[in-house]
Amino acid sequence: MTRLLALVSVLMLSSFSYADHHALALEARQSTSELEMTSITVGDDFTVINAETLFEIYGRAYMTFTLSYNAEGNGGTYTFEGRAYLDEETAASGSGAGVWNRDGTKISMHQLVNVLGGTINLDIITIDPLNRTGTHDVYAVK
């Protein structure tokens, strides 16, 4: 059910960009962050990717992506959990869901994230498993 809700949400956001011929303008919350993949666990039904980064606005963040496959195995849906530590007294958590696809060895992911406190982000993530790197862009939805 969560996956279906995430997929519908992403599709709705993309359809808003074409409503009345107006483009959807999203504001970046920060510059692009570089990801470091810390582990990948591959299974028959899903793959789990763990990564970390240093965000300008959230501080040190640890993320887990659980990817389910489509019939072709080159995309699907996923869920996300993240924890961030801005300083010794400030922590935040977020959860979300999205869609992913693979082009060659690169994985492209689009997710909606509900951050503790009511903030909603659209994240666009590109992962390069071969080099254990990636990029993470964060856009303000709410």
Give residue spans per PLM region:
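Sec-dependent signal peptide recognition
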Residues: 1-8
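Beta-strand-enriched cores of mature, soluble protein domains
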Residues: 18-142
